[in-house]
């Protein structure tokens, strides 16, 4: 099973669930697995999968201590009804869009990342993370301890984090933002 250690030290070896639960290593580093470069994913096979299948396969490979059922539930909960597009992050052909270059130019595509509940690209991650955290062993059903997320924002991250953790079992969230330094819309969203 893959273990995770800090980018600043190899002292502590953690499971994926424990690394997700802790978030940041005690030395301030990020958690990473040495097996990341060794994990094999069939890239050609991914090309024909929808977002849900793709997410299940990639997350299942990178987070081996989560069961296939846990990963599937996280993916379905995170993206099933919270995104405006069934494709979650649709890739759109820019052909025919105003301002397109000459017909002889290379095809151009763009991935739309604003279909989440707060229209911020951060929704893609912040809808998944709370579901993964809610399934960490120390926060499993019936556990007495809770996870408290404390974060700061100067914009879209705050609302995306609040939306992601809003219904996460065993998790709470507090978002700080600088008074008068976020837009009125962002302030109202939070």
Question: Which residue stretches match the model-derived regions?
Answer:
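PLP-dependent amino-acid enzyme catalytic core
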Residues: 1-190
